[in-house]
Design a protein with these regions (language model features):
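Feature activates predominantly on carbohydrate-active enzymes
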Residues: 2-189, 212, 216
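Active-site neighborhood of glycoside hydrolase catalytic domains
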Residues: 148-245, 249-260
Length: 261
């Protein structure tokens, strides 16, 4: 509740609500040069208000990412999703975080673990949760230079190999385990978009792969976020759906109408 007379009074059930009330006052003054008297009750219609930035294909210094994140807070968005690995122009392979895997980290710009951890914690003070995505088993060209034997082709991991499953697990272990994990948020994006559905055998392996990593991150107390892909990869292998967040970006990959029970 925002009440303005000869003084500004903001009441809210949480610190986040108080922060948004303050933002409303600042927005009003910035727009009109004054703050009108009266009462206003405001609340978020959607619990998740998010946007994604692809920092893989185009390196953005962390200082600027932080500035953008503060703008998210100003417009009352409460999550920012960072896509950190992909394939760049001219075959340049990109992984934007410092990694224990030798040769994996991008050479044209990356974020150290310490500075990335600090950035995420600082943004929580602005009410914005940073969700980091490691995209596998497609969009995986960045791994070709370090584990070429695990690649199906230039951009896809070979998920038929047990060694691939162990390699991807080691990546998540590196970033979500420990007393002070690199990924601060309880939510972890595991990717899973745009893999082949040309053969039923591949589809079933992809579904098993997706289910495996959902359960893996949950085992560390995290909530899995995935790209919608299971309409594209329709099959028999069950994939856990309870308490999962799905980013449905294209109906050809995940059609909401066919997924409603």
């Amino acid at each position: 509740m925002l009440e303005i007379s000869d003084r500004v009074n903001i009441t809210a059930p949480s610190a986040q609500g108080l922060f948004y009330g303050m933002v409303t006052v600042v927005q009003s003054y910035y727009a009109d040069g004054a703050v009108p008297c009266g009462k206003a009750r405001d609340y978020a219609y959607y619990p998740i208000r998010s946007g994604m930035i692809d920092v893989a294909r185009a390196y953005i210094p962390l200082e600027y990412v932080e500035e953008i994140t503060k703008y998210f807070a100003y417009f009352k968005l409460n999550e920012i999703h960072l896509h950190i690995n992909d394939i760049g122009q001219n075959g340049y392979n990109i992984f934007r975080l410092e990694s224990d895997v030798e040769g994996l980290t991008a050479t044209d710009g990356y974020y150290t673990k310490d500075e990335y951890r600090t950035y995420q914690k600082r943004m929580l003070d602005y009410g914005v949760t940073v969700i980091t995505e490691i995209d596998t088993p497609a969009h995986s060209a960045c791994f070709a230079s370090v584990v070429p034997e695990l690649m199906l082709d230039a951009n896809h991991l070979d998920i038929s190999k047990p060694e691939t499953v162990e390699f991807v697990k080691s990546l998540f272990d590196e970033y979500i385990t420990g007393d002070d994990p690199v990924f601060v948020s309880r939510k972890v994006h595991i990717g899973t978009d745009e893999y082949s559905n040309a053969k039923k055998e591949v589809v079933e392996k992809f579904r098993a792969f997706t289910d495996h990593y959902i359960r893996l991150v949950e085992g560390f107390g995290k909530q899995a976020v995935i790209w919608g892909a299971l309409t594209h990869a329709k099959g028999d292998t069950p994939v856990k759906s309870e308490n999962i967040i799905m980013n449905a970006w294209y109906n050809g990959y995940a059609d909401p109408a066919t997924m409603i029970c």
